[in-house]
């Protein structure tokens, strides 16, 4: 783990030196576009980004070369977002959860039980009236969100204690993403929130620094968490999107013609990633069950939901601009009230 971090630091240092020296090109006059994310090369996110790279290289290959860096090679998600702010890298995929430190508007999508179903979630996230006030809120910070990616439903998983009710979380140290909303959620559920970067979770589980975590099913297999955690409980507390963030200065530097191609490419990331997602979840669950010995539990979600609902009022009262967006999401929840997950 230490070696991997040193490699990431050295690579980031090299990128920054290259930027300062004006060496952002490929040596043949083309502009290198660097994209960082924290998943492996088989993950739907990486497949979507590779499709984007192929698309841009095909359409604008005489001007740009797209390079995709998986598995936190350019640093943690937070570090990569900061590098995207400065332009050291151009595009990063990051969870909405960590974005609260850049704009409070992002806290809305971190609320537990914000969406009543996957169908309502997808419909709301595809509506610019819902997403634009949030995705464009970081323009002054140096970047905007150009599209969203499906990260499924987040659920609790633990090393050796099944979670069937909120009371089962009492006394357990649970890794959460690094956001105030997630910490507050765990406090309301009775667990002990332990914020940490995704790349540190496996070691923390293995060494029993934490008792469990919360994420979608792919974390069990793609990241090996199912080798350590043997109980996965479908409490379905969050549907938090991953975001494709792009440096604003880079976008502003594009000609209208090139920007149109990039916008089409951003839509392609979303299309490919979401098309791959459902099959990847099904495959991960089968692998976790049959090869890793993970037990899947289906608790009543109502007690979990009841425990965290005060968080909705807290976030909305602290940022009244979010209320109209929240109301639009509730309208989608009502529209898809009969939908299944």
For each predicted feature, which ranges?
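Short, solvent-exposed secondary-structure boundary motifs
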Residues: 1, 133-138
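Bacterial N-terminal signal peptides that target proteins for export
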Residues: 1-10
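Generic detector of short alpha-helix boundary/capping microenvironments
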Residues: 10-11, 130
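Core hydrophobic alpha-helical transmembrane segments of single-pass membrane proteins
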Residues: 13-17
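C-terminal motif of bacterial Sec signal peptides marking the signal peptidase cleavage site
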Residues: 18-22
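N-terminal secretory/targeting leader peptides
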Residues: 24-119, 138-341
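A gly/proline- and charged-residue-enriched helix-loop-helix capping module
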Residues: 118-135
